[in-house]
Amino acid sequence: MSELASHDDAPAGGALVTALGRRSVVLVGMMGAGKSSIGRRLASRLNIPFVDADAEIEKAAGMSINEIFSAHGEPYFRAGEARVILRLLESGPQVLATGGGAFMSEDTREAIRAKGVSVWLRATLEVLSRRTKRRADRPLLKGDDPQSTLKRLIDERYATYAKADLTVDSRDVPHDAIVDEIVAGLRALPVLATPGGAP
C-alpha cells in the first residue's frame, strides 16, 4: 500500500493536489534545513513528483555544484539556477526543492509566486550547523569558520525567506510530523482556496 493511500490524511492530500492544479510546492530555506529529505516525503504523501533543483542544475551543467562554483563562480551558478527553476516551474504539480540562495532572486520569487506555492523550512543556527557538518559538498561553507558563515547567511536571508507563503519549523522531530504541518498549512492558505493553479 502506498504512503498516500495508507496515511490518515490521504483524502486531504488528494484535495490539496486538486487545489494546486499545475502549481508546484516550492521548498525554500538554508542548506541543512531538510528541503530534499522532507520534500521527498511530502511528494510521496501527495503522490506527485519530487524534483531537486540542484540535481537538475548539475545535470544541465554536466558538473557538480562544487565544480560550477570553482570553475565559474557564484554569479554564474545563480544565473543558471534561475533558468533551471523557471523551466521546472512549467512542469507542475510537483514538490520542488530549491538551493539556499534561489529565493533571494526577486525574479525567481516572482516566478514561484506565479507558478507555485512557497514553503520556508525555517531552522535555527544550531540545527543547521549540526546538519551541515555531515556534508562536504557545501561550497559556501568551505572557509575556516563555517559557523560564522551560516550566521551571516541567516542574517542576510531570513527576512527574504519570510516572504514565503508558508513557514514551517524544521527541527529534530520525525520528518512525517513536519510533512503533516506542511500539508495542514497548505490546506489553510487562501491561495489554495480555489482549484486550478497557473494556466
Pin down the residues of each PLM region.
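ATP-dependent small-molecule kinase phosphotransfer cores
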Residues: 49-113, 137-138, 160
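Conserved lysine of the Walker
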Residues: 35
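Hydrophobic positions on the alpha1 helix immediately C-terminal to the Walker A/P-loop
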Residues: 38
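Hydrophobic anchor at the beta1->P-loop junction of P-loop NTPases
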Residues: 27
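A glycine- and Lys/Arg-enriched "phosphate-lid" helix/loop adjacent to the NTP-binding pocket
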Residues: 114-159
